[in-house]
């Protein structure tokens, strides 16, 4: 798993540049409706995430390999009014910048859930796995032995990654699945090195 930054959970946007970027990235569309000026902050965060993933892949990806980016879906179904395609926007931008990188909306949630960053309950990979399914229209483009990078904004417990990787590897057991996260979450006062 790769991550570029450290996000300090429980701290506000003023705590660090990363906290500000992550919180802007997570601005909800209903918040933007109430305050349209916030859209620019969300868009800048999306662009910055895409820029950093592009730089990482240009630096680390063997140019002879192809990579499929798969956004880990948000907690809401596509038809839900609070559905947010922010991670999808990131992977689209990255794929547009690197010719050996493509993207697929390979995963979707079947039931909308409360977003995990707003819940007090823990993250359970089994609960997440139960509502994840493969998008069959996208699955037909996966080749055996593909390299898939699951992309998400913050790695907290790894529950979403674990559930998503399991769902993909059930169908495509010879596929290599890695994770790319913009940031790893740490608790306030805990070093990111631990």
List each language-model region with its residue ranges:
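Generic recognition of short, well-ordered alpha-helical segments
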Residues: 82-85, 89, 159-163
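Noncatalytic, basic helical substrate-engagement surface that gates or grips nucleic-acid strands
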Residues: 72
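PRPP/pyrophosphate-binding module of the type I phosphoribosyltransferase fold
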Residues: 116-194
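Structural motif
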Residues: 66-69, 147-149
């Amino acid at each position: 798993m790769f991550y570029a930054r450290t996000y300090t959970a429980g701290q506000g946007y003023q705590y660090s540049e990363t906290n500000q970027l992550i919180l802007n990235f997570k601005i909800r569309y209903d918040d933007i409706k109430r305050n349209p000026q916030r859209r620019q902050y969300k868009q800048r965060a999306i662009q910055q995430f895409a820029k950093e993933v592009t730089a990482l892949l240009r630096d680390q990806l063997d140019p002879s390999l192809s990579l499929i980016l798969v956004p880990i879906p948000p907690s809401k179904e596509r038809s839900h009014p609070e559905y947010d395609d922010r991670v999808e926007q990131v992977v689209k931008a990255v794929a547009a910048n690197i010719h050996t990188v493509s993207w697929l909306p390979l995963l979707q949630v079947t039931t909308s859930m409360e977003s995990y960053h707003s819940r007090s309950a823990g993250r359970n990979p089994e609960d997440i796995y139960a509502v994840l399914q493969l998008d069959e229209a996208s699955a037909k483009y996966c080749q055996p032995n593909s390299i898939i990078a699951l992309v998400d904004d913050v790695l907290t417990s790894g529950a979403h990654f674990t559930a998503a990787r399991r769902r993909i590897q059930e169908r495509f057991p010879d596929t290599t699945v890695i994770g790319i996260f913009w940031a790893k979450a740490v608790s306030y006062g805990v070093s990111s090195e631990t």
